């Protein structure tokens, strides 16, 4: 009898272990995520972001270095901007506090490496994942003396960097502009590129793309808007005796092998905000041409 009881206990134990192992294996299989859809070029997910064709929810990971969390006001205005221009029924925010990488400056390659290490939100089911990193280090190649500083950049279809330390420094340069103003404008501008603007995954209804010098000194389309006062407008920066844009060299240093959809300069944001402040307006909006483009690609307005 005792032997029979022992046999039953052994059978139950083996069955339990087997079930637990199978359950664990199933869980691991279910939680595995295909990250490839979040590693595409800037603008490749424009329609997916704007419309509800494939995804009805945006999950945005706000990854920030301790002490460099974006202001609540900026994030509220940013999510309002997304609701205004996309058909997403739900926008979820996931805050991830990170330790400092202890770097004096960051290149896009270093930023991408940090994303690989720290990102937790990806596309899954009907949810589209976005990653935004708020750093405590400026961009490689910044030149404070010449006023050439980078506030943010998009470098993949769902990836963005905001140089929060530089955002805060820029906000101190004007008594009429605060930290939230600079954060909001930077976030909205860079996300405009994830919308596919300008001609960066979302086709132009009418030609309104501005031009700037490339490395060879030729004027080429620069994926920004040529309409005055538009959020997606980029101001050219000249600071050398030859008149060649200093931004060309600093951008090449910053990109370091990774192509950026946009490297947003402090001068551009400061000019946009000061123009709007002079008109008594607090926010910088998309112009009519950009609105036409995103509507044609599945956006709201």
Question: Where are these predicted regions, by residue range?
Answer:
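Propeptide-to-catalytic entry region of secreted or membrane-anchored zinc metalloproteases
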Residues: 22-140, 278-283, 287-301
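Generic structural signal for residues positioned in beta-strands
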Residues: 59-61, 131, 159-161, 230-231
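The catalytic-center signature of Zn2+-dependent metalloproteases
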Residues: 174-275
């Amino acid at each position: 009898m005792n032997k029979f009881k022992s046999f039953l206990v052994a059978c139950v134990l083996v069955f339990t272990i087997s079930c637990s192992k199978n359950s664990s294996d199933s869980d691991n299989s279910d939680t595995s995520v295909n990250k490839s859809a979040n590693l595409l070029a800037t603008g490749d997910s424009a329609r997916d972001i704007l419309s509800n064709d494939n995804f009805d929810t945006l999950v945005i990971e706000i990854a920030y270095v301790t002490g460099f969390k974006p202001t609540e006001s900026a994030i509220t205005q940013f999510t309002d901007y997304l609701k205004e221009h996309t058909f997403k029924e739900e926008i979820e925010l996931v805050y991830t506090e990170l330790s400092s990488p202890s770097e004096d400056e960051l290149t896009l390659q270093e930023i991408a490496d940090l994303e690989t290490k720290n990102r937790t939100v990806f596309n899954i089911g009907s949810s589209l994942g976005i990653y935004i990193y708020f750093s405590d280090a400026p961009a490689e190649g910044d030149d404070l003396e010449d006023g050439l500083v980078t506030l943010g950049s998009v470098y993949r279809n769902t990836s963005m960097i905001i140089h929060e330390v530089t955002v805060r420094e820029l906000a101190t340069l004007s008594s009429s502009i605060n930290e939230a103003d600079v954060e909001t404008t930077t976030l909205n501008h860079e996300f405009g590129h994830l919308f596919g603007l300008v001609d960066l995954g979302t086709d132009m209804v009418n030609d309104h793309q501005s031009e700037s010098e490339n490395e060879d000194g030729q004027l080429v389309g620069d994926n920004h808007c040529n309409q005055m006062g538009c959020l997606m407008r980029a101001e050219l920066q000249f600071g050398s005796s030859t008149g060649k844009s200093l931004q060309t060299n600093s951008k090449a240093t910053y990109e370091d092998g990774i192509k950026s959809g946009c490297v947003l300069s402090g001068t551009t944001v400061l000019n946009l905000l000061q123009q709007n402040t002079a008109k008594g307006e607090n926010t910088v909006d998309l112009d009519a041409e950009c609105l036409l483009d995103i509507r044609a690609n599945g956006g709201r307005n």
